Regions:
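Active-site-adjacent loop/helix surface patches within enzyme catalytic domains
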Residues: 24-45, 50-153
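Non-catalytic cell-wall polysaccharide-engagement segments
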Residues: 1-22
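Basic/polar, cationic surfaces and motifs that engage anionic cell-wall
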Residues: 12-15, 125-202
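N-terminal pre-domains immediately preceding structured catalytic cores
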Residues: 20-46, 179-202
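Secretory-pathway/luminal and periplasmic proteins that interact with or process carbohydrate-rich
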Residues: 2-7, 89, 163-172
Length: 202
């Protein structure tokens, strides 16, 4: 991936140059309006991701996914890819916008890619998730949660933001395990029995 890594560096430099440039003055046709004046504040930092979206790749191998994510014509990417063996590939700086969510919505968020980190798990969409893979995922989630102060409820799946067109990660994904570790939510399995003399009319 020497050639694609070179393209990555070129694009990052181009975006950095764009961010560093002062905004261009926009001339107003209406002379009654004052032109904008740029005064750079000294109080700022980088915007942080606030969501983590978990996917399955729906492909046959990690290598196939890496190739897919490095072909310009596919227009799809993720920040991280985790192989069945547990090997973790970091493909994009966390502060940059990956193309992993597509059309979707969560609460009032309609541009999920702009506020999230995308994690792809090597899985054909039907098989169980390997323990080595899950261990790598949990380690990564722990780091991301601490580094960016991501709320527990904001670790969700692709199927959550696009339920009518996506179902990943598949039904075998251990959401309960993740919730127990502090990533995502799980329903309360403790149910209280209804008293025998319960009067539903009251």
């Amino acid at each position: 991936y020497t050639s694609t890594n070179k393209v990555y560096k070129q694009k990052v430099k181009a975006y950095a140059k764009e961010i560093a440039a002062l905004p261009k003055e926009i001339p107003f046709s209406d002379s009654a309006l004052l032109p904008p004046y740029w005064v750079g504040t000294t109080n700022f930092n980088l915007r942080k991701p606030t969501f983590v979206i978990i996917h399955h790749t729906a492909q046959n191998s990690c290598d196939q996914t890496l190739k897919t994510f490095t072909l310009p014509r596919t227009s799809v990417s993720a920040h991280y890819v985790i192989c069945k063996s547990g090997v973790l590939h970091h493909m994009l700086n966390d502060y940059l916008r990956a193309w992993h969510g597509g059309v979707g919505k969560w609460g009032n968020q309609t541009d999920i890619n702009s506020v999230s980190i995308g994690i792809e798990l090597d899985n054909n969409g039907f098989e169980p998730f390997d323990s080595l893979q899950m261990n790598s995922l949990l380690s990564l989630l722990d780091r991301l949660k601490k580094q960016y102060a991501i709320p527990t409820a904001n670790f969700i799946g692709h199927g959550d933001i696009a339920p009518t067109r996506k179902n990943d990660p598949n039904y075998r994904f251990p959401w309960k395990l993740l919730a127990e570790k502090g990533f995502g939510l799980w329903y309360d399995e403790n149910r209280e029995a209804v008293p025998a003399d319960f009067n539903h009319i009251q």
